[in-house]
Amino acid sequence: MGYNIIAVSNQPAELEAVAASLRTEYAIEAHAIYADLAERSAAKMLFDRCQSEGWEVEILISNAGMLLFSTLTNTAPERLATIIDLHCTTTTLLCRYFGEAMKQRGKGRILIMSSSTAWLPYPTISHYSATKAYLKNFAFALWYELHRYGVSVTALFPGAVNTPFYKLSDKMRSRLSSLGVLMRPEAVAKRGISAMMRGKRRLTPGLFTRLVVVICAILPARVLDIIIRIKPIRELLERI
């Protein structure tokens, strides 16, 4: 018998389909809640809904995200606000509400989806990587605040994941997947859940991703700038 699921999304058709599939395949309760998590009121609404329904949330997974390839000066301010609220504000408030309930019960698990870009200077998504750096530091600090009360906090730092986020041809997807640049979402999810259940503080899945993070950390900024200006590398960065 697995965990019952509360799934939240702003895509109602896909949300209902996923919930129905979970009920059928795993014989669990799967509740679908339509919400725009970029709204600042969303976290409180979800917490209040769970309270009113009597749903005790043992595991909180903050995974909602959006990606927009655009330099900062070419990005509309409204889009910047949406990304910041979705990644930073809502995650923080969800952890505030549900984290307090977990603390009072003396048990719980939180998984926060950051990104390998939290460690990297990534041109064309400076706004995105900055929000992921916030989540990195937030998750690390929150672990210190909650682990003594029986609540674990795990931060996940995947690289590029093979999802519709990236507008790639089938040939390019296949090539990047074979090189380990693109990871299967199922593999990332499985490793993230495993790390969370073992109480790990952090996980960067994938050898390629770990190597990139280490290399970028030790290279001088001027050298890294020269490398990312090389045309094939620049074009690849703009696509993944």
What does each model-found stretch correspond to?
Residues 12-13, 34-45, 77:
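The beta1-alpha1 cofactor-binding region of Rossmann-like NAD(H)/NADP(H)-dependent oxidoreductases
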Residues 71-72, 76-84:
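Substrate-binding pocket helix/loop in short-chain dehydrogenase/reductase
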Residues 115:
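Residue(s) in the substrate-gating loop at a strand-loop-helix junction
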